[in-house]
Amino acid sequence: MNAPTTVADSVTVPVSLGDRSYDILIGKGLVERAGEEVAKRLKGVRVAIVTDENVAAVHLERLQASFARAGIDSTPVIVAPGEKSKSFATLETVTNAILAAKLERGDAVVALGGGVVGDLSGFVAGIVRRGMNFVQMPTSLLAQVDSSVGGKTGINTAHGKNLVGVFNQPQLVLADTQVLDTLSPREFRAGYAEVAKYGLIDRPDFFAWLEANWQEVFSGGAARTKAIAESCRSKAAVVARDERETGDRALLNLGHTFGHALESATGYDSSRLVHGEGVAIGMALAYRFSARMNLAGIEAAERVEAHLKAVGLPVSLAEVPGGLPPAEKLMDYIAQDKKVTRGTLTFILTHGIGQSFIAKDVPPAAVLEFLKERLAIA
């Protein structure tokens, strides 16, 4: 596993993918340093900065000034905030804006925003002129520790989440920890679900550290930077082994099969459920289901739920506002999960804290019965 290195006020985590390797820089002040860092790696480029209205209001001017200082011309492309921008309509709008600006294949798309902007921008960068350069500047905790690393990009459809997209690795990730101070408490908590996930997959020591230090992670400082760097380190190691999710990269989907089904069931309405909240409930359900299938003790599920509750995350179906459809409908959404192979269900289940594994051919009847039980409790 690649160890983070500290250089100048930032931590660097390498992602090792041969000639497509890149660095994740983590630290304060990276928005101001962005022009300098991009100019080092991509000579003579112009950039399209894809961002949403909320992020643009707070960070766009500083980023454009940084690019201007480095002699880089930038064109902003601003989209509506929220999951609904991961759509064919917005994809077309952003693509047309980049083409209208006459950006060339050797130029770059810079994603300044959370996971939605990153996923959308990466897809655009992968298909416009058959592939432009791509730089991730994640502004949410969730994006800094998860979606900005590893090259997964895409949009949603009426059939489910992330069903259309490409693998497109960035040339650079700049994770400015200072921008996290502008997040709402709810947004920060949602991102923390993905941080906890890395401990639950295969790093019980990291999960125990989070249990002891989560309050400092939330308040900022060294613990926050460490949590982000360790999360990126975990993901970078998995991506280096299995870039295209043909093997154990699927472990990173712990909690996501249930979570994506809940997001679909709530119509991607962020007032009801955001991605990280869906993942938190999904991880709690994965641990409960593992216990129900006699794969793990109930104590592990209770420990996971206790920690997620402590930080203010939901852990049950009852906590989804506005109610949920019947278990049969949730199963329809689960059947659209990208881990489904030839009609059989694949889940990330667990033998305990830090002992997750890929479970293939999970009996649909067992999942349906489990969902009925959890909905009845709701």
From Swiss-Prot:
InterPro entries: Dehydroquinate_synthase, DHQ_synth_AroB, DHQ_synth_fam, DHQS/DOIS_N, DHQS_C. Catalyzes the conversion of 3-deoxy-D-arabino-heptulosonate 7-phosphate (DAHP) to dehydroquinate (DHQ). One of its GO terms (cellular component) is cytoplasm. It catalyses: 7-phospho-2-dehydro-3-deoxy-D-arabino-heptonate = 3-dehydroquinate + phosphate. Binds 1 divalent metal cation per subunit. Can use either Co(2+) or Zn(2+). It is found in: Cytoplasm. Zn(2+) binds at residues 194, 256, 275. This is 3-dehydroquinate synthase. NAD(+) binds at residues 115-119, 139-140, 152, 161. GO terms for biological process: amino acid biosynthetic process; aromatic amino acid family biosynthetic process; chorismate biosynthetic process. Keywords: Amino-acid biosynthesis, Aromatic amino acid biosynthesis, Cobalt, Cytoplasm, Lyase, Metal-binding, NAD, Nucleotide-binding, Zinc. PANTHER family: 3-DEHYDROQUINATE SYNTHASE, 3-DEHYDROQUINATE SYNTHASE, CHLOROPLASTIC. Its cofactor is Co(2+); Zn(2+); NAD(+). GO terms for molecular function: 3-dehydroquinate synthase activity; metal ion binding; nucleotide binding. Gene3D superfamilies: 3.40.50.1970, Dehydroquinate synthase-like - alpha domain (1.20.1090.10).
